Amino acid sequence: MNNHGNADKNWGNVQLVEFSGASEKPKVLLIATLDTKPTETAYLRDCLEGQGIQVIHLDPSIRRTVAGAEITPDMIAAAAGTNMQAVRDLRHEGKSQAVMMEGAQKLAHEIDAREGLSGILAIGGSMGTTLATSVMRSFPYGLPKVMISTMASGFTTPFVGTRDIVMVNAVCDIAGLNTITRDVYRNGALAVAGMAKGYRRPEKSARPLVLMGTLGTTERCSVMVRSALEREGIEVMVFHTTGSGGQTLDQIVRERDVTAVIELSLVEMMDFLHGGLCSGGPDRARAELQKGVPTIFVPGNCDFVIAGPIEDAHARFPGKRYHIHNAALTAVRTEAVELGHLAKHLGELIGEAKGPVSIYVPLQGFSSHDSPEGHLHDLSMPPVFVKQITAAVAGRVPVHTLDVHVNTQAFADALVQQVLTYIHKEA
C-alpha cells in the first residue's frame, strides 16, 4: 500500500491506513501528485520529517498511480464513490479533477477527525493548486495551510478565497530541483512545520462575539467602538471592507456563533452597485440577516465609490468630484442617485432579515473624506439618504439619525449602546 510502515484501517467504505508513530509528533497532510512531481514530493517529505513532523501524503494523481503515498488515488476515487479507471475514462481534466476534489476533501476531514492534523502543505501548478486549495478552504481558520504554487504571483482569489492560506511562489516551474527551488520548497516546508509545532486547536469562547466592517476612513469610529465593547468583555473582530474583507465577515457569520454585526462601512455594496473596485458581490451581508444575527447598518464610506487611477476614474465616472487617495485608487463622490440605489438595495436585503436590524445615520458626514477636513464633504447628502432609506425599509426597522459625524465619540457610543441592548435582550 505504501512505503512507510502503516497498517491498513477501514474508515467507512474506504480502506485507509492506521498512521503509526509517536503521538506527540505534529501531523501534516502533504498534498502532491506522484505521477508528475515525485522528486519534489520526496524532497518536501524529507524536509518535514527532518523537522519532526509526521507526514500523511495524499496523492491525487490522475494519469497513473505510483506507490508511496499513505492516501492513494484509488482511495480518493473510492471516497468519491467511483474508481480510478472510471475517473480516467472521463477523458476530461476538469471533470476528473472534480471527482478527485470531492474524495480528497472527504478523506482529509476523516484523517483530521481521527488523527488530528496540525497543518496542510501542498505543491502544484494550476491543477494541483485548484485541488489542494479546495481542500484547504474546507478547513477552519487557524489550521496552518501553505500552498507552493506556480500560480502564487498572479490572481490568487480563486485559490485563497476568504481563507488563511499562505501562497508561496514556486518561482520556477515545478520540474525537478535546482538551486532556487530547493530553497523555495524547503522554506515552504519549514514554514508549515513551524506553524504545525505551535498549532493549538481553537477552544470555543464563552464571550459574546461581535463582527465589524470598516475602512481607514471610518477607522476612528471603529477603534472607539471596539475599545468600548472589549471593556465590556466582548470579543470584536474587525474586517477591512475591500471586497474580500466583507466576504470573510459573511463566512465567519455562517461558521460561528456571532452575537451581533456592525456594518460600519457599506462601500462594498456601493461599489457592487456602481462598478467600483471593492465590490462585495450581491450577497454581501445576506448571511447575518438570514441567520437572524442582530445587525446595525451605518452608511459609512458611502460618500464615495472606489475607482482606479484618476484617469480611469474620469473615464468611468465623468463629471463627478474626485479625491486621489494614492496613485492606484481614487475616491469618486456619490450623490443622490447613487445613494438612492444603495437605499433600495439595502431595503431589499433587510426585507430578508430574520432578526433585529437597526440603521444609524450620522448627519455630519459618512467618512473622513466627507468631513470639513476632507475633500468630498457634502452636508446636503445625509438628509437625502435618510429620506431614501426610510422609504426603502418602510417602517420595518428603526432609522436613527444623529447630528454628528461618523468619526465622533457620540456616534460610536450610540453604536455601542445598541450592541449592548441586543446582547442584554438575548441574555
Language-model features: where?
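Glycine-rich phosphate/diphosphate-binding loop of Rossmann-like nucleotide-binding domains
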Residues: 37-49, 56-74, 205-255
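A C-terminal functional module that forms or caps the active site or interfaces directly
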Residues: 350, 354-356, 360-393
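N-terminal phosphate-binding or glycine-rich loops at protein starts, especially the Walker A/P-loop
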Residues: 2-64, 119, 129-138, 142-147
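Gly/Ser/Thr-rich loops at beta-strand to alpha-helix junctions
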Residues: 33-39, 118-131, 211-221, 242-244, ...
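Short, acidic/small-residue loops that bind anionic groups at enzyme active sites
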Residues: 131-160, 169, 237-241, 284-299
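A glycine- and small/hydrophobic-rich beta-loop-beta segment
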Residues: 267-344
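Short Gly/Thr/Asp-enriched flexible loops that form oxyanion-binding sites at enzyme active sites
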Residues: 124-141, 222-225, 371-378
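Phosphate/nucleotide-donor binding subsite
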Residues: 67-116
